[in-house]
Amino acid sequence: MIAHFAREGYVTLPDFLPPAELPGLQRLCEAILVERVESAQAAGGFGWDGTTTLWVRLRREEELILEALPLGPRLRHTAAALLGAAPADLRIGGRIFYKAPRVGRALPFHQDEAHRDPAFVHNSLNAFLALDPATPCSGGLRYLPGSHTQGIRTHVAIGGMHEAVGIPDVDPAGVVTPSLQPGAAAFHHCRLVHASGDNTADHPRRAFVFVCEAPPQRLATPLPRPWLASSLSTAELQY
């Protein structure tokens, strides 16, 4: 596991979540999604109808619920082993990614570290915990193996969309798209070039995604990342 992650920049664990734990996490995911949408609508926010992609940052109290489950220490120790860090040193933040059936949109190739504070070298990974089948048809993750060893690539606006900042020139020949069944997990390094496809399946693609961060290393001079000004607010740079 550790050797594969170091070489390829990602690793998939098909049996990461025992079957008995899956229904509870699926129910928790649905409850959070419903609460967020209802709260936003009540406040006069967006009118989400369930037919688009939805990204939700978990509140601290929701993260604490997950940390108290058997999933919590399992996630922390697995991520720490892959990053070569002490489990207690990790900061872990949670999100929910929801891609609606047949209409959930693709995300362009990018590197997570390219969207983080350029004053640091980051040592982190994303853990994608599938709650539905995540396959090439349902918008599964697409990885460029080994690309995490090649530095940060230039990111540009894709298709003129403000929120879609990515890498335009990735050769698809080397890309892999692992298929994950519910309960499987995929871990990828913050410098790995990756994307996700459209959801053309008849089912949603729900996932908990956990950003697991070991302490970053401060640089004497911040790295140039001009795309940050157009793709992120400074509030997103929480380091």
Where are these regions (language model features)?
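Short, solvent-exposed loop/turn segments at secondary-structure junctions
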Residues: 17-19, 97-99, 103, 114, ...
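Non-heme Fe(II)/2-oxoglutarate
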Residues: 33, 39-41, 48, 154-159, ...
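Generic beta-strand structural signal
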Residues: 88-94, 105-107, 123-129, 139, ...
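Short, conserved beta-strand element in jelly-roll/cupin
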Residues: 117-136, 179, 211-215
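A short beta-loop-beta micro-motif enriched in histidine and acidic residues
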Residues: 112-124, 173-174, 180, 203
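Short, structured patches in soluble enzyme cores that scaffold and shape functional sites
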Residues: 111-113, 129-133, 145
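Non-heme Fe(II)-dependent double-stranded beta-helix
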Residues: 1-8, 14-109, 115-118, 223, ...
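Double-stranded beta-helix
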Residues: 134-195, 217-220, 235-237
